[in-house]
Amino acid sequence: MVLAFRSLSRTIKSPSPLLHSKSNFISRVNQSRRIPSLVANMATPARTQPPWKEPKASSAAKLKVWNSLTRTKNDFIPIDPEGKEVKWYSCGPTVYDDAHLGHARNYVTNDILRRILAHYYGYNVKFVQNITDVDDKIILRGRQQHLLAKFKAENPTVTEEVINTTIKAFDAYVKKNLPLLSQDVNIGSFNSDSAEKYANVIQGKSVDGVGPPGDKEAKIKMHLRTAGTAVTSLLAPSKSTPEDVDVFYAGAEDVLLPYLDSLYGSSIDASDHSVFTTLTKKYEARFNEDMRNLNVLEPDVVTRVTEYGNEIVSFVDKIIKNGMAYSTSDGSVYFDIENFEKREGNHYARLEPWNRGDTNLQADGEGALSSVKTSEKRNDSDFALWKSSKPGEPAWDSPWGPGRPGWHIECSVMASAVLGEQMDIHSGGIDLCFPHHDNELAQSEAYWQKEGGAQWVNYFLHMGHLSISGSKMSKSLKNFTTIREALSRGDWNARSLRIIFLLGGWHDGIEITPDMRKSGSSWESYVTNFFYKVRDLEVHPNISSTATEDEKVLKSFESAKEKVHSALADSFDTPTAMRAISGLITDYNSADKVGLSDSVSFDVARYITRMVRIFGLDGTADPYDGGIGWAGIDIPSAAKEHVYAVSRERDEVRQHAIVGDLSDEVLDSIISQHNAAKQQDMEALPYAEVLSTFQENLKALASKKAPAKDFLDLCDQLRDTHLWDLGIYLEDRENAPAMVRPVDAELQAARDQKEAIARQKAEAKLKREQEEAEKKAKLAEQAKINPKDMFRTEEYSAWDEEGLPTKDKDGADVPKGRTKKLKKEWEKQKKLFEEHLKA
């Protein structure tokens, strides 16, 4: 039985956001992408990029973009003659595992650029995103998980047979991945043997101890952890309870997976595509959820490899007919690089010509299930367009026999099917430059062959890496934090992560350090506090404004807008744009608010709101609805009536208490303004109760003729306890009403720190008091001793009539100097003893 593709050439509206990269394709020498000279030792006929054809402009370009096809900034000119439509294809997920923060870097950054083009420049962007649901990694993972599940079902307890199988799996894993260990290494000596043989790696050095560690050493550490975890499971004293069995399999899983596949992988009935689709559907759904949680816009069109089977076969067949691909006797089809480059205008490896001879990158691009050497390939660099399926691999009908598409051809076909013979933008992670994107370009240009050569993509955008404290995230190295893990732990949220990417730029790599996180948090707090201030003007208008500061703030406003515009036009320079926004807020904060019109404040705030929404920092909010602020700065709607009322009452009480004229008449006037006793809905009830309780407490204090201090203490209690516990804070300001705001993370952290300091002081005080009490108690006990008895110890053998020692224990006279010191101690004790007797 052959697993059939579902033919689908029409475009598909996505039900959910999909913006992922070829996730595991990242173990490589990244420096070579930026510095061609680093790979000068590789055999390659070309080291410079070929000419790029600039699109014809119908009007002046609005911006420049860094184009990987030229390694410089080019005017952005859409293909659309009217200059309105933009066709964009973005490489999407290979759905076999959860996405990590490195993937978030790619998709969120793609989303930022897409939003700027659409919402700032007004382009009508058609954004196409693919799902890779046929791939070597998917086949391997699906097969391995299927076999492990079957093995666990057949072995619900840890029997001797399971132990023996796991030991064999461990041996196979160590032999393949840790070659410095002896071939007969056993589980009992593994920890000591590995500590000796891989001491340099464990100590953070390279394997040979010369030079810094790299990906090779990172992989060795991963293999040491995997093997070590399996050893722990094998040596566990108890494996009898269901919990023990779960722990055993969890520790042994990573050595069992490849071993079971090596034994039984080829026996899998690959026509049962549920083996693979169970995996891909699960992780596509989880990926969609991750993207929603990161506030990434849905693609306009989603394509899946399994929905483009007929198109892929037709695409490959046309490349063969165009003379730039050939089939082999096993039913595979390879791209003919030599014949391709014989055609005028054709160039292989447009993006990274200096890497075209890198056999490691080529092998990565061909996939884990590809043969190391194919004798029928005309050139070692020729890459697979169609792979003949081996036993245990899914297969599709084709003119060349049962097989499956190569990785690179999938994107070429899907992008061409939706966007046609040419697109404006193609994007993805920097790791995909060579060979994936270079192969995409070559095979697509071979398909759309034109006189003088085709230019399938006009602008190639590659997102920089993400590293955390120097370590690049990689699934192959198992050193990643998944998106859902980071969000659920509270390490990040959609806004904080996006701010980091905005501050770091899109093209260069970003390293998240403590300082970088602090900068992102500070920027967010700065903008949030600005929004608080301006939104407060809606409740407390500045009616006495003299407008003397308007001109200065408006001048700064215009300057900031120009800086932001210039920055975005300069290849989406978001770091500069972010600095311009915070600089505008600084100028606003320095202005004398008495001399600033509310209308100017609102204009500045609306602009900043529009920009942060364009950047995707405020959920799905419309950048052009005229709103002010972003999510998180409002108190609940049900709270507003009662909280603003109690805040006004509190302001008046404090004002009168401070000046000393808080009479009963004044208090009655204040309380009578708001009635908290009326019936409330359930959501409003807690806030109404706060207002009611405050009014009752005011009346109680008034009836007792309490001093002003008690009223001020009550006002503090309202702020610090009653409202705080409901997530609301009243920020007292000099000569202005209190500002009502929600309790946010910054406020909570400040209070936690304040309380921690107070606790430390209280604990230190208590310790001092305890030590003082102990000291006093010790002195009290000491005072009870008669000075005549204090030296009657074994240290001495004779004393005078006052109890002072005259002979030591050996009968020798006590030295005069010693006697003098003893006399002082005796006199001190005599005084204490006399005071004790008096007491």
Residue spans for each PLM region:
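Short, well-structured beta-strand/strand-turn elements
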Residues: 123-126, 322-329, 726-732
